[in-house]
Amino acid sequence: MALTLDIVTPEKRVLSVQVDEVRAPGVQGGFGVRLNHEPFMTALEPGRLTYVEGGREHHYAVGGGFLQVADNRVIVLADTAEAAGEIDVDRARKAFEDAQNRLLQLTEQDESHSAESARVRRAAARLTVAGR
């Protein structure tokens, strides 16, 4: 028996697969889910979501969202989700640099500071997952 992992973004169902384990970046820290885990729901930070299938790890960059666990099913509702091998590193690096430059020009009191900070975290997550 295995966990069912579903990753869904506003655009599409990214993935639906049977897995042995899921590790995700929660807003209160990283956590793991295995078979027969207690039900819960949490918000996700931008970061690396890893799942283990047949002893092999697979990595996704998620741009925040929510994760729910119930009845051996893990549902990830992510703002964005990209497999490590699908990330355009040059584009991710440019997005990171652009967001960082915009953030440096803002103060914490600026209305767009929070959104720009989130863009930096999403771009950094993409670069990390891509291995760059």
Swiss-Prot record:
SUPFAM superfamilies: Epsilon subunit of F1F0-ATP synthase N-terminal domain. It is found in: Cell inner membrane. It comes from the Bacteria. This is ATP synthase epsilon chain. It comes from Anaeromyxobacter dehalogenans (strain 2CP-1 / ATCC BAA-258). One of its GO terms (molecular function) is proton-transporting ATP synthase activity, rotational mechanism. It is a peripheral membrane protein. PANTHER family: ATP SYNTHASE DELTA/EPSILON CHAIN, ATP SYNTHASE EPSILON CHAIN, CHLOROPLASTIC. Produces ATP from ADP in the presence of a proton gradient across the membrane. The keyword Transport applies. One of its GO terms (cellular component) is plasma membrane. Belongs to the ATPase epsilon chain family.
